[in-house]
Amino acid sequence: MSVNVNRSVSDQFYRYKMPRLIAKVEGKGNGIKTVIVNMVDVAKALNRPPTYPTKYFGCELGAQTQFDVKNDRYIVNGSHEANKLQDMLDGFIKKFVLCPECENPETDLHVNPKKQTIGNSCKACGYRGMLDTHHKLCTFILKNPPENSDIGTGKKEKEKKNRKGKDKENGSVSTSETPPPPPPNEISPPHAVEEEEDDDWGEDTTEEAQRRRMDEISDHAKGLTLSDDLERTVEERVNILFDFVKKKKEEGIIDSSDKEIVAEAERLDVKAMGPLVLTEVLFDEKIREQIKKYRRHFLRFCHNNKKAQRYLLHGLECVVAMHQAQLISKIPHILKEMYDADLLEEEVIISWSEKASKKYVSKELAKEIRVKAEPFIKWLKEAEEESSGGEEEDEDENIEVVYSKTASVPKVETVKSDNKDDDIDIDAI
């Protein structure tokens, strides 16, 4: 699950996202440590080396840190909860990632070890400034500058501007002329010629460049759409699924779209609520016929999924509410059709019948629907009792009596009676 990079922004459509931190505690006793499993992904979203936030945790917690770059293992000694580290990460983002002006995380760090300064530039608003180097992490950053923040970054830009300025003043530079040597205090980039030949989309207006830009933008937009859909609320995702199913029906291809519909529901992470959408789109007053027609569609959602079956029952209530006059008396038959089609299990139906909910229809209608369903519910319970009773009888029939030769025989003692008349003479019998 992803969260906003700037968690003070509650907008769900905020474009800057990062994965939620995952922490795993390993070891025991003095060797206990917390491995931040997805630190590489988090750091990538922040445009910072993964060692920076890990070291920041160590500075804030007063704990030692370990970096295994080859195996992507970033460790903080001690046992620490993921939520605690996530809150602590907000402090790192505020100090070392967000722009002080626009509060967007589109910043780059520019480290100058000689001057012991860390510059900060924002690509969103153009802000340029210096970071406060009093934090302990700054010492680590000065010793380990980010790869994209070499000292010559600003100088490269200056050299590029100088070259462009000279081109404007002197026209195009001829190949026979030797370019002027760089100033003694600056180091010319080793691939300056290659940099000049890089594509600059801001200046290239050819049809090929425009087409290439549009292709990349469209591909990127598709990826954003897929990820953005999962960031929406459940209600919004259900509405997307509803529009998808409705479109299939309007196009006349709903009968063969059962696999596509369940795949879309899984993509939107609302598979259990699929039957609720299907009932609204596919069912009307002819529901008994439609259950048979669209059985395969519902079975893909309801098979061995009790939650989906409950949503199917709630969907049925909604259909009855829309066609109450035609369907209210047919409730037992409709439930029997769904039961026979293996869309509903006994346990789910009985549980649903025991409590009326006003979440989808009025409380009065929910109660009335359950009253009308009583004959079928009663039949279900009786059938269940009969089946359980039959099983007990079968068990009794299958019991095998085993006689033991070593079993002890109880000893019978004769009791003498005081009444002599009651004595029986065995010889006289």
Swiss-Prot record:
- The source's domain of life comes to Eukaryota
The UniProt regions of compositional bias labelled Basic and acidic residues, in chain numbering, are 153-170
Entry's Gene Ontology BP terms: regulation of translational initiation; ribosome assembly
This molecule's function is given as: Component of the 43S pre-initiation complex (43S PIC), which binds to the mRNA cap-proximal region, scans mRNA 5'-untranslated region, and locates the initiation codon. In this complex, acts as a GTPase-activating protein, by promoting GTP hydrolysis by eIF2G (EIF2S3). During scanning, interacts with both EIF1 (via its C-terminal domain (CTD)) and EIF1A (via its NTD). This interaction with EIF1A contributes to the maintenance of EIF1 within the open 43S PIC. When start codon is recognized, EIF5, via its NTD, induces eIF2G (EIF2S3) to hydrolyze the GTP.
Looking at the UniProt record, the site noted as Arginine finger sits at: 15
SUPFAM superfamilies registered for this protein in UniProt: ARM repeat, Translation initiation factor 2 beta, aIF2beta, N-terminal domain, Zinc-binding domain of translation initiation factor 2 beta
List GO terms (cellular component aspect).
cytosol; plasma membrane; synapse
Residues with Phosphothreonine modification: 225
Renumbered to this chain, region (Disordered) spans 143-216
Q: Which residues carry this modification: Phosphoserine?
A: 10, 227, 387-388, 408, 417
> Keywords on this record?
Cytoplasm, GTP-binding, GTPase activation, Initiation factor, Isopeptide bond, Nucleotide-binding, Phosphoprotein, Protein biosynthesis, Ubl conjugation
Positions binding GTP in this chain are 27-34
Where does this chain mainly localize?
A: cytoplasm
The location annotated for the cross-link Glycyl lysine isopeptide (Lys-Gly) (interchain with G-Cter in SUMO2) is: 411, 416
Domain W2, first and last residues per copy: 231-390
Q: Where in the cell is it found?
A: Cytoplasm
Q: Name one GO molecular function term.
A: translation initiation factor activity
Q: What is this protein called?
A: Eukaryotic translation initiation factor 5
The root-end lineage is: Eukaryota, Metazoa, Chordata, Craniata, Vertebrata
- Cite the record's Acidic residues compositional bias ranges: 194-207
**Subunit and interaction comment:** Component of the 43S pre-initiation complex (43S PIC), which is composed of the 40S ribosomal subunit, EIF1, eIF1A (EIF1AX), eIF3 complex, EIF5 and eIF2-GTP-initiator tRNA complex (eIF2 ternary complex). Interacts with eIF1A (EIF1AX) during scanning. Interacts through its C-terminal domain (CTD) with EIF1 or with eIF2-beta (EIF2S2) (mutually exclusive) through a common binding site. Interacts through its C-terminal domain (CTD) with the CTD of EIF5B. Interacts with FMR1 isoform 6; this interaction occurs in a RNA-dependent manner.
